[in-house]
Swiss-Prot record:
Signal sequence range: none
Location of the region described as Disordered in the Swiss-Prot/TrEMBL record: 356-381
Name assigned to this protein: Small ribosomal subunit protein bS1
Residues annotated as domain S1 motif: 16-90, 108-173, 194-262, 279-348
Keyword NADP: no
Function description: Binds mRNA; thus facilitating recognition of the initiation point. It is needed to translate mRNA with a short Shine-Dalgarno (SD) purine-rich sequence.
NCBIfam families per the UniProt record, alphabetical: PRK06676.1
Lineage start: Bacteria, Bacillati, Bacillota, Bacilli, Bacillales
Length: 393
């Protein structure tokens, strides 16, 4: 009979089998389970009750719970015809966890997990077993102190699974990047030219300032920072500063947004009505050269154009032949259009024309008064003499 009993025992449940049963008794360091369809009870040591660290078996199970476990060892006492199955609930939980995580990895799904511990290299999380989020995969932004994450439930993506080495690597950064991309798409759709919105200066370059307007950076070109001439963006704004910006253009395909701070500020032209009039001669500073002329600042934020034809009495091919940025010049006001913020200026009109022939005013007037029919009256040759000799007609 003992032989028959042994054989049935061995053939009944073997090491590696998956079994189910009801928790019958909870002891200090183990749990007794009535294994379904088996001749002996199962024993689960406290170390095999959970994938998490527990101090008491009752932290993992309660009497009457129906649980599953793997058989890790079959113990049988032939002499007393008694036996027991050593079980691992932890092994089964780990297997199920890997199956779930592999499915999420294959389908690029997002999961949620609670941070159980903050360590030097990152975050330990509960994903049915121990998972790890390295510091480099915690956020798209730099974070110096991770302590605030302890106890938080995070959205994560599975980056790497290695069951053989009990290695589960997850990323919060990947989730953030995806969320940021979605927010960017939504924001780009909502932006309209002419809108005035609030943003924060994110970084400065020599050609302008990038402003964060809600997860997307737009560029304020250096020429759009102020009504006044700006040499360097850092002279006007600083990183972290909150500013109002006007949307000048949005290219949704290239995700480029052009912004202006200048357009949100009062125009200095509003304060010059009656200050500058046609014919006035004033001083200004050359701030910019173009192929068609030079822009001269005559008051902070107020620039006028000296057309290339108004720079010199002599022919010039380029404004740079006569002028350079920073040069102080005298200009004559040719016209003022405050409504359209345009001022026409002339440098030429303030300069003597060396090509104009100087004449004796009295002699010339005499010629004009008396005419040239009388032979006693002077001719043009008499008036100008040798002055006409070198002049080309």
């Amino acid at each position: 009979m003992t032989e028959e009993f042994n054989e049935s025992m061995i053939n009944d449940i073997k090491e590696g089998d998956k079994v189910t049963g009801e928790v019958q008794e909870i002891e200090e360091k183990q749990v007794i389970v009535a294994v379904n369809g088996a001749k002996f009870n199962g024993i689960i040591p406290i170390s095999q009750l959970s994938t998490h660290h527990i101090d008491n078996p009752s932290d993992a199970v309660k009497v009457g719970d129906e649980i599953g476990a793997y058989v890790t060892k079959v113990e049988y006492d032939e002499e007393n015809e008694t036996g027991a199955y050593i079980l691992s609930k932890r092994q089964l939980e780990t297997e199920k966890s890997y199956e779930f995580l592999q499915e999420q990895l294959d389908n690029n799904q997002t999961i949620e997990a609670k941070v159980t511990e903050v360590v030097k290299g990152g975050l330990v999380v509960d994903v049915g077993q121990r998972g790890f989020v390295p510091a480099s995969l915690i956020s798209t932004d730099f974070i110096e102190d991770f302590s605030d994450f302890e106890g938080q439930v995070l959205k994560l993506k599975v980056e790497e699974l290695d069951p053989a080495n009990n290695r589960v690597i997850l990323s919060r950064k990947a989730v953030e990047a995806l969320e940021n991309a979605e927010k960017k798409d939504e924001l780009l759709e909502s932006l309209n030219e002419g809108d005035v919105i609030e943003g924060k200066v994110a970084r400065l370059t020599n050609f302008g300032a990038f402003v964060d307007i809600g997860g997307v950076d737009g560029l304020v070109h250096v020429s759009e920072l102020s009504h006044e001439h700006v040499k360097s963006p850092e002279d006007v704004v600083s990183i972290g500063e909150t500013v109002n910006v006007k949307i000048k253009s949005v290219d949704k395909d290239s995700e480029r947004i052009s912004l202006s701070i200048k357009d949100t500020l009062p125009s200095p032209f509003e304060s010059i009505k009656g200050e500058f009039n046609e014919g006035d001669v004033i001083e200004g500073t050359v701030v910019r050269l173009a192929n068609f002329g030079a822009f001269v600042e005559i008051k902070p934020g107020v620039q006028g154009l000296v057309h290339i034809s108004e720079i010199s009495h002599s022919h010039i091919g380029s404004p740079s032949e006569a002028l350079e940025p920073g040069q102080v010049v005298s200009v004559k006001v040719l016209g003022v259009d405050v409504e359209n913020e345009r001022i026409s200026l002339s440098i030429k009109a303030t300069l003597p024309n060396e090509n104009v022939i100087e004449s004796d005013s009295e002699t010339t007037q005499s010629y004009l008064d008396n005419g040239s029919d009388d032979e006693d009256n002077p001719t043009l040759g008499d008036v100008f003499g040798d002055k006409l000799k070198d002049f080309k007609f």
